[in-house]
């Protein structure tokens, strides 16, 4: 819904009232999407995005580093299938990423709960592509078990899911006894 698309100008880069996290979905023939979120532990604010097609590792690393420097990103969650890129970013560019938890249905449910409870808001000025992707995400009615459709909308949506779901699960793990 459009009520989730707002001006998030009040969230400033490096504002320590928030933790800044990111999700990275890598598309070797499809688009790469890097999303930046601010969270206070309850709400998630999508504050920035970088979208590219067929980008070299060096260009992608440069763009990610700019976002890390600008926002003060604490954690980057990457598609666990992208191990070569994860290694290249770490060894060649000193950009460290954590493997995302890829529990697709649970991750989608976590994002859906945030949206339904107005706890996921998207910056109208900086994140139009990701907003459109989230709004266009579809399930494949032809599969026996529910699976999302792999199309243009899935990459940004996956990056959001990686960031939110993995961060939620890891944060809970910190306090687990």
PLM regions and their residue ranges:
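Short beta-strand scaffold segments in enzyme catalytic cores
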Residues: 32-38, 161
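A conserved active-site cap/scaffold subdomain adjacent to cofactor or substrate pockets
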Residues: 20-24, 31-34, 48
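ATPase catalytic-site recognition across NTP-hydrolyzing enzymes
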Residues: 1-24
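Charge-patterned, long linear interaction tracts outside catalytic cores
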Residues: 150-177
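Mg2+-dependent endonuclease catalytic cores in nucleic-acid-processing enzymes, primarily RNase H-like
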Residues: 40-148, 170-176
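Short, well-ordered loop/turn elements at secondary-structure boundaries
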Residues: 16-18, 28-31, 71-72, 116
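Residue-level detector of short, conserved catalytic/binding motifs and their immediate flanks
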Residues: 32, 74, 157
């Amino acid at each position: 819904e459009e009520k989730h698309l707002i001006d998030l100008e009040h969230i400033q880069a490096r504002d320590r009232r928030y933790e800044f996290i990111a999700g990275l979905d890598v598309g070797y023939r499809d688009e790469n999407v890097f999303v930046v979120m601010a969270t206070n532990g309850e709400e998630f604010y999508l504050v920035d995005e970088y979208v590219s097609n067929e980008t070299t590792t060096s260009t992608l690393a440069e763009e990610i580093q700019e976002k890390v420097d600008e926002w003060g990103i604490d954690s980057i969650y990457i598609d666990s299938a992208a191990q070569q890129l994860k290694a290249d970013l770490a060894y060649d560019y000193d950009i460290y990423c954590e493997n995302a938890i890829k529990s697709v249905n649970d991750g989608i449910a976590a994002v859906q709960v945030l949206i339904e409870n107005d706890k996921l808001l998207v910056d109208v000025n900086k994140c139009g592509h990701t907003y459109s992707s989230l709004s266009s995400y579809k399930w494949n009615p032809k599969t026996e078990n529910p699976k999302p459709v792999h199309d243009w909308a899935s990459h940004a949506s996956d990056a959001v899911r990686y960031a939110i779901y993995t961060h939620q699960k890891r944060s809970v793990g910190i306090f687990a006894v």
